[in-house]
């Protein structure tokens, strides 16, 4: 009996340890509003090195994306994301897509494929950062796609995480809801602090490399 109890205790401890070590790094370090946004350097879809510091002095939007995710498709099929990108570009805002899906997992693409996807859906980000190792995604604690981060002209994180106020995956659910990214950009444009600076994440889990 004593042996069985000890054996079960060992199994329980091993299970707890496995769960602890399996917790993704994305759960550990959510960036802070008002603090410097996590600096990064990555490679874009054309092989160019891109750093966040390249855009100091400009407002920037980071869009963690996965074209196979229904929540991402919701915003692209309705033209919502493209409209945001166009309006942002018109205001001199830099919009960067970040693709953190690991090779062999849902949403992974190479540079040519990423550009073809955007051309097909008329998306116009300023750049596409390929992040197959998940380094940039983890820096921003991106748990889901889409994850949105708005960085002000001083380099501080001004808004973080959900694109809007409705976590329904159907395209019709966009109508009549508050778009948090659009609202944040409008406030920054006139020199105001973002009134709703942090929201609850929703979407598909980011397909990080193990």
Positions of the model-derived regions?
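Bacterial N-terminal signal peptides that target proteins for export
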Residues: 2-14
């Amino acid at each position: 009996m004593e042996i069985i109890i000890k054996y079960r205790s060992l199994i329980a401890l091993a299970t707890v340890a496995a769960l602890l070590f399996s917790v993704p790094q994305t759960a550990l370090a959510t960036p802070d509003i008002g603090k410097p946004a996590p600096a990064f350097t990555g490679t874009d879809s054309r092989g160019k090195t891109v750093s966040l510091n390249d855009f100091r002095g400009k407002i920037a939007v980071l869009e963690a994306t996965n074209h196979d995710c229904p929540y991402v498709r919701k915003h692209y099929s309705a033209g919502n994301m493209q409209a945001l990108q166009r309006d942002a570009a018109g205001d001199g805002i830099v919009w960067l897509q970040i693709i953190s899906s690991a090779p062999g997992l849902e949403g992974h693409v190479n540079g040519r494929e990423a550009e073809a996807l955007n051309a097909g859906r008329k998306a116009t980000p300023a750049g596409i950062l390929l992040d197959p190792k998940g380094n940039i995604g983890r820096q921003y604690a991106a748990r889901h796609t889409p994850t949105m981060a708005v960085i002000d002209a001083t380099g501080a994180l001004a808004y973080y995480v959900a694109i809007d106020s409705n976590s329904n995956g159907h395209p019709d659910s966009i109508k009549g809801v508050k778009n948090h990214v659009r609202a944040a950009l409008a406030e920054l444009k006139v020199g105001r602090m973002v009134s709703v600076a942090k929201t609850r994440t929703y979407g598909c889990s980011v397909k990080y490399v193990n």
